[in-house]
């Protein structure tokens, strides 16, 4: 006798149906993004149904968070790609694909070999530990030599950018990214690096400027250059140069009384500007509008004013100049002013910008991106952000490993060796983990248009015979020494990919029941 315990709008999937639903959803997500993997990967064109805007990208996290998904298992993979993006900045596609391949192998073990999911989980845990141990042993640390470490950073940036829209100019952008990160002196705070996108020109025209650039200009009749700048950054209303008494009615019997009211408003504004001038500043930056009258008052007092600076720009400017955003002006002694050596108005393309040089935070810099279309600039910014994120993490975790499928095959070898020391059905799960790892170089070769069966078997033979620096040369379709080619990746990135993918697979393997409830509606009763 079956008993209905769920409401009418609740659906349930049990046992094999639930597990199959989870596997199918996760594998479908992996198949969706795997064609973007590697230096020869393809892009996806995403079009929004609501705004009708288009986006061209091959960034795994961007693709997955832009598409609505209904399958709960698919959403788990979307979440791990987001975490990978937040933690390391790159490897989002790799972690999604590896999770999907682990689940594909698990499905075969459950369906064909009738192995219990808990046995597979135990095997995957042993395999993951063996893989990460092999990865650690293969890692190289050149942080003791500044020249070699800089070379490592450039190689990592090139490897990251080789699968992006910037691949044709990866040498140029790798230098830009490395120089910007080295200015941070070990910090991972990318807020000090401003990225500005300007339409026009080509990607190779992009450059790094050692200063902070704000997309604004000084007020009318104000000097275009300020030296030894003392900067007050504010978020306050300076637009009351008109009568603005909202929600109030008043009667006057002559225009003179109306003039008195306007005069009182102007006196109030004049007093506010006088308070601001007591801070001893020569530059005032406001997040809100500055109307003509207060701007003229600033000019008369020898203070340059900048209005309507965007929120992100104001926050970042406060950070790099050492100031803070204020909204009241009663206690000048308690306010931190921003400082820089020079502020000057410059032209980039056909737009005016303000350049802040010699900022208090000496690591501040700006990367100016040029490109023909908005889509190109947006994807270039995403690509560059990935490279900057990976490089900033590498300055903390300085170890590196080899790319081109080398690290995956080294881990696969270690996992296969581990499988020989394990009895029972768990060894089958460990071997399945090794096969999933080998799928990454297989997909790299497939995406490049080469015979993956031949290439990957050659790579496997080379690695298993002790040549631990071998990898896929996807430009020539051969096996080559990755160290000589400079195909280097961050150790932290590879470690995060393997550990996150195995954890995600474990989470979904434990599922034996999926319960879906529709969102509550206004007329739906609360239990």
Swiss-Prot record:
Upper lineage: Eukaryota, Fungi, Dikarya, Ascomycota, Saccharomycotina
Sites of N-acetylserine modification: 2
UniProt-listed CDD domains: TCP1_beta
The name this protein goes by in its record: T-complex protein 1 subunit beta
Subunit structure: Heterooligomeric complex of about 850 to 900 kDa that forms two stacked rings, 12 to 16 nm in diameter. Interacts with PLP2; this interaction leads to inhibition of CCT complex mediated actin folding.
Role of this protein: Molecular chaperone; assists the folding of proteins upon ATP hydrolysis. Known to play a role, in vitro, in the folding of actin and tubulin. In yeast may play a role in mitotic spindle formation.
Family, similarity comment: Belongs to the TCP-1 chaperonin family.
Record flagged with keyword ATP-binding: yes
